[in-house]
Amino acid sequence: MYGIEYTTILTILISIILLNYILKTITNTMDYIIFRFLLLIALISPFVRTQNYGMYLPITGSLDAVYTNSTSGEPFLTSTLCLYYPAEAKNEISDDEWENTLSQLFLTKGWPIGSVYFKDYNDINTFSVNPQLYCDYNVVLMRYDNTSELDASELADLILNEWLCNPMDISLYYYQQSSESNKWISMGTDCTVKVCPLNTQTLGIGCKTTDVNTFEIVASSEKLVITDVVNGVNHKINISINTCTIRNCNKLGPRENVAIIQVGGPNALDITADPTTVPQVQRIMRINWKKWWQVFYTVVDYINQVIQVMSKRSRSLDAAAFYYRI
């Protein structure tokens, strides 16, 4: 009886020792294989020219630093281009293969198939509030509208620059602008903005805080308003809240990887009057407005010149944003 129990225990112990030996052998073998594999990769990696995918970055159109390709210097072979256009263009062209056609044409300019993306938008006002700019280079086509020239220039200011915005509760609080880069941005179907500057005793300067009819009107019945008032002075604000919203925004700097192409119009819109736009320059292209196919053909022809004055996936407070017209 006892002999059987001892034999069973001995068998279990031998099995455990044998299993432990097998596991150690497998571990040592795997370590040897992995070490050899990593050594081989380390030895041949300097001789292989491939895209470095070691860093994943969610691209929103604006980063604080430039991330360049570490293994290849060809700008177009390792870059992506997004072309944003109004939905009316696709409706006018009415061709299911038009994007493929344009991709083939971009290929003749050095952009590989699959590196150019086409994205439509229905409303430029909505698009400009929070533009989703996914590519290394982003080109926005904006149709000129002579009924909203001021709105268009302010839309361009929103798209070409990075803004940090917060909602405002004008029914409870007074607000002041702290610097030239601090603006109040109102947007809606009908924005009428009135302001009343206040002294240190919170009494109106040239207006009565209890009577909005005495407030200064800075914008009337507009879709987009970028309001600039005297810095360091509290203001009581009144807007048409049913048709308009207002936000307190700070301009962080230009989106260097974004360009706007103005489609049509007798004159190019000027967004450089704002002292926060540095340097005071704009770059302009011109062709006569005809049809959307003509517009896209021109974009293909000049795309490389446009790209050369942009910066890949970057934003710098010391560099210019760029505005084009065709």
Swiss-Prot record:
GO terms for molecular function: metal ion binding. Ca(2+) 1 binds at D95, G206, T214, E216. Gene3D superfamilies: Glycoprotein VP7, domain 1, Rotavirus outer-layer protein VP7, domain 2. Ca(2+) 2 binds at Q177, D228, V229, D301. Glycans are attached at N69, N146, N238. Disulfide bonds join C82-C135, C165-C249, C191-C244, C196-C207. Its main location: virion. Belongs to the rotavirus VP7 family. Homotrimer; disulfide-linked. 2 Ca(2+) ions bound at each subunit interface in the trimer hold the trimer together. Interacts with the intermediate capsid protein VP6. Interacts with the outer capsid protein VP5*. It is found in: Virion; Host endoplasmic reticulum lumen. Some rotavirus strains are neuraminidase-sensitive and require sialic acid to attach to the cell surface. Some rotavirus strains are integrin-dependent. Some rotavirus strains depend on ganglioside for their entry into the host cell. Hsp70 also seems to be involved in the entry of some strains. Keywords: Calcium, Capsid protein, Disulfide bond, Glycoprotein, Host endoplasmic reticulum, Host-virus interaction, Metal-binding, Outer capsid protein, Signal, T=13 icosahedral capsid protein, Virion. InterPro entries: VP7, VP7_1, VP7_2. The keyword tRNA-binding does not apply. The keyword Glycoprotein applies. GO terms for cellular component: host cell endoplasmic reticulum lumen; T=13 icosahedral viral capsid; viral outer capsid. This is Outer capsid glycoprotein VP7. Residues 1-50 form the signal peptide. Residues 165-167 are annotated as: CNP motif. Intramolecular disulfide bonds. Residues 253-255 are annotated as: GPR motif. Pfam families: VP7. Calcium-binding protein that interacts with rotavirus cell receptors once the initial attachment by VP4 has been achieved. Rotavirus attachment and entry into the host cell probably involves multiple sequential contacts between the outer capsid proteins VP4 and VP7, and the cell receptors. Following entry into the host cell, low intracellular or intravesicular Ca(2+) concentration probably causes the calcium-stabilized VP7 trimers to dissociate from the virion. This step is probably necessary for the membrane-disrupting entry step and the release of VP4, which is locked onto the virion by VP7.
